[in-house]
UniProtKB/Swiss-Prot annotation:
A lipid is attached at residues 75-76, 78, 80, 83 (S-palmitoyl cysteine). Residues 108-139 are annotated as: Disordered. This is Synaptotagmin-1. It is found in: Cytoplasmic vesicle, Secretory vesicle membrane; Cytoplasmic vesicle, Secretory vesicle, Synaptic vesicle membrane; Cytoplasmic vesicle, Secretory vesicle, Chromaffin granule membrane; Cytoplasm. It comes from Pongo abelii (Sumatran orangutan).
Length: 419
């Protein structure tokens, strides 16, 4: 008995110890990392089990996964872009506000600029003009002349003595000067000096006479114009000057030098038009010119009319072969003639001849002045060449055409050209 109870007492403590140890093991908390790993492994296990249940091959599953990833990435990209766009709009708004904001420095600068402009307006200067220096006047040379009046014969005597320091208008560094002298306002009578070749200091020593009653002289102006002669084109004006007759003392002879001024640009004077027909018969070698009419002729007489008639010259190589004239039509600027003239021209010569038509104003006392001139045939151009060509293309048929009259000197220069 004693031994049994002793054994129980000895065995009891270990039982109690075990009991106390077990509870401590059971209630010990699990670490957070271990819990998460268990949850993830459970989800993975579950997901894999579900995948195994789907009746699809592995490659199809991979494709679906890739598409899903792409969709996610696209969504992310769109969200980012939207955010960036909003930021940019905000920035723009700030900049706009900055631009519209008034800068006091700019206002001051603007005020200063406006003040400068007002100052310029008062003085009448622009920026370019402020810096520009006054240009020197172009020197055109000078002319020495003399004036006298013959009271006994009612004549104005104009002497063209010499010119000096003329500008060079020709290629060789010289000019071919001559002087034109006329009275305004009528311009009816014009005089010209001889042409002096290749010189800038010509000596003329020529005198011209205008028959003008002294009572009418005060209302006239004398013009002296220096020209450069050109054989093949229009003569260039070098310079001119005007002398009002009411400023001249005719109690003695006036002799002086005057500087040439730039000539006023004169409009091409209208001289009028003429209509004539041409007819050529090659077999007979006969050229017929019919002067039909003229219109709007230049006024040549004091009464504002003219006494026009027409001269026709047949020319070859600068020589006048034949000359014909119409009748004179009195006091008219629109004469009607209808007069026919014939010339013998062999067929082999027709391409070498020229028909020169000149309208003149008849004057009983003095020289008959040319109103205007035109020529057809060899070396002609424009409307004149077309008229001649039409005549040759239509033998035996009269071809009529209107022509504009040209200045006599210009036509003569063209006739002098040899091709």
């Amino acid at each position: 008995m004693v031994s049994e109870s002793h054994h129980e007492a000895l065995a009891a403590p270990p039982v109690t110890t075990v009991a106390t140890v077990l509870p401590s093991n059971a209630t010990e908390p699990a670490s957070p990392g271990e819990g998460k790993e268990d949850a993830f492994s459970k989800l993975k296990e579950k997901f894999m089990n579900e995948l195994h249940k789907i009746p699809l091959p592995p490659w199809a599953l991979i494709a679906i996964a890739i598409v899903a990833v792409l969709l996610v990435l696209t969504c992310c990209f769109c969200i980012c872009k939207k955010c960036l766009f909003k930021k940019k709009n905000k920035k723009k708004g700030k900049e706009k506000g900055g631009k519209n904001a008034i800068n006091m420095k700019d206002v001051k600068d603007l005020g200063k600029t406006m003040k400068d402009q007002d100052d310029d307006a008062e003085t009448g200067l622009t920026d370019g003009e402020e810096k520009e220096e006054p240009k020197e006047e172009e020197k055109l040379g000078k002319l020495q002349y003399s004036l006298d009046y013959d009271f006994q014969n009612n004549q104005l005597l104009v002497g063209i003595i010499q010119a000096a320091e003329l500008p060079a208008l020709d290629m060789g560094g010289t000019s071919d000067p001559y002087v034109k002298v006329f009275l305004l306002p009528d311009k009816k009578k014009k005089f010209e000096t001889k042409v002096h070749r290749k010189t800038l200091n010509p000596v003329f020593n020529e005198q011209f006479t205008f028959k003008v009653p002294y009572s009418e002289l005060g209302g006239k102006t004398l013009v002296m114009a220096v020209y450069d002669f050109d054989r093949f084109s229009k003569h260039d004006i070098i310079g001119e000057f005007k002398v009002p007759m009411n400023t001249v003392d005719f109690g003695h002879v006036t002799e002086e030098w005057r500087d040439l001024q730039s000539a006023e640009k004169e409009e091409q004077e209208k001289l009028g038009d003429i209509c004539f027909s041409l007819r050529y018969v090659p077999t007979a070698g006969k050229l017929t010119v019919v002067i039909l009419e003229a219109k709007n002729l230049k006024k040549m007489d004091v009464g504002g009319l003219s006494d026009p008639y027409v001269k026709i010259h047949l020319m070859q190589n600068g020589k006048r072969l034949k000359k014909k004239e119409t009748t004179i039509k009195k006091n008219t600027l629109n004469p009607y003639y209808n007069e026919s003239f014939s010339f013998e021209v062999p067929f082999e010569q027709i391409q070498k001849v020229q028909v020169v038509v000149t309208v003149l104003d008849y004057d009983k006392i003095g020289k008959n002045d040319a109103i205007g001139k035109v020529f057809v045939g060899y070396n002609s151009t424009g409307a004149e060449l077309r008229h001649w060509s039409d005549m040759l293309a239509n033998p035996r048929r009269p071809i009529a055409q209107w022509h504009t009259l040209q200045v006599e000197e210009e036509v003569d220069a063209m006739l002098a050209v040899k091709k």
